[in-house]
Amino acid sequence: MSHPAFWEDLYQRGGDGWELGGPAPALVDFVETGPPPRGRVAVPGCGRGHDARYLARRGYGAVGFDFADDAVRAARALEAQDPTGASFERRDIFTLGGDYANAFDGVWEYTCFCAIDPARRAEYVRAIASILKPGGWLLACFYPIRRGGGGPPFPISRSEIRRHFAPRFRFERAFPPIRSVPRRSGQEWMVLTRKTY
């Protein structure tokens, strides 16, 4: 999971079961009903870029990052066919702080956190905090909310979410999403947080 080859293989074999074919319902509902402030937004683990492209259409300066070349190529191809202004880069999310320190007003997290090795979750939180401007927002839909089981996707609990993010982020809202992908219904948890420094 910590190597691009793992994800490339999944894309090449059609094992990308996380692919929705469009933006995440939880993101769409949140942006349509109470959008976070506009600005430059990072989308880590963007896959084929549907969420980043949706955010760009809604007036955000969206940049999608993914570990897998195939994902970035697919996202760029979709963007070329139907331009939204989103851009896509093949990057290791754990090293983004080197080039993007305090560069983003917001981050949208969905299915990236659950895909990484749980032993690297604290490192992920540090990486996300490093690319956000002081006071920047993190909107996340965490999945799967359950105990036990392997992955990816690796399970997480609401208490673990708070434990990992509270040292660097202030929680403003936490709630079940209005809509979920049917197979994920009851297993997702939305949070809106602010970087505390």
Regions found by a protein language model. Give the residues of each.
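Conserved acidic residues
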Residues: 105
